[in-house]
Amino acid sequence: MDKAIYPGTFDPITRGHEDLVRRASGLFREVVVAVAASSGKKPFFTQEERVAMVRQVLTDYPNVKVMPFSGLLMEFAQQQQARVIVRGLRAVSDFEYEFQMAGMNRTLYPDVETLFLTPSEQYMFISATIVREIALFGGNIEKFVHPLISTQLGMKIASKDKSSR
C-alpha cells in the first residue's frame, strides 16, 4: 500500500503508539505521524514539544515522517495525498468513538479509508493520560514510554512544580 496517516495528540507518545507505528510502517510505503494541535483538550506538552518528542522516538523508521497539523484531519490527508487513516483500538469504548469518526470521515472524503489496528497485548492498557497521571504522582513510567519521554515528562513536571510555587 502507498501512504497512510496516523493522527493523534501524542501527549506524550507511548509504547502503544510506537507499536502501532512499527506495524503500520510495515504495511505502507510511507506513514505520516500527524501530531494534532488538539483543539478540544489542553495538552500537557505544546505541539512543538510533542512533534520533537515523536521525531526523537521514531528515528529508526525511515519510512515514517512526523508532521504537525491543525484543522480537519481529512483535509490534511488530502494535502498529503494519503488514502488511509490508521487508528488504534484498545477497548470497546475506543471502537464506538472511532467507528463514528470513520463514518463521518468517509462521508466527507469517500476516497480515504480508515484502518483500525489493535496494539500488541502488552500495550493494550497504556494511554497517554494514564502515563501522565502516574508520572504526576511520582510513579515509574519506564515500561510505558521510551526513556527520552520518561526524562522529558519528568523535566516538564518539575518545571510546572517550580512555576506553581
From Swiss-Prot:
Keywords in alphabetical order: ATP-binding, Coenzyme A biosynthesis, Cytoplasm, Magnesium, Nucleotide-binding, Nucleotidyltransferase, Transferase
InterPro entries: Cyt_trans-like (IPR004821), PPAT (IPR001980), Rossmann-like_a/b/a_fold (IPR014729)
Needed co-factor(s): Mg(2+)
Top-level taxon of origin: Bacteria
Keyword Calcium: no
Catalytic activity reported: (R)-4'-phosphopantetheine + ATP + H(+) = 3'-dephospho-CoA + diphosphate
Pathway as given in its UniProt record: Cofactor biosynthesis; coenzyme A biosynthesis; CoA from (R)-pantothenate: step 4/5
Binding sites annotated in the UniProt record for substrate: T9, K41, L73, R87
Gene Ontology MF: a single term: ATP binding
GO biological process: coenzyme A biosynthetic process
Residues of the site described as Transition state stabilizer: H17
GO cellular component: cytoplasm
Subcellular location: Cytoplasm
Protein family (similarity comment): Belongs to the bacterial CoaD family.
Functional description taken from the UniProt entry: Reversibly transfers an adenylyl group from ATP to 4'-phosphopantetheine, yielding dephospho-CoA (dPCoA) and pyrophosphate.
Quaternary organization: Homohexamer.
Protein name per Swiss-Prot or TrEMBL: Phosphopantetheine adenylyltransferase
Species of the source: Nitrosospira multiformis (strain ATCC 25196 / NCIMB 11849 / C 71)
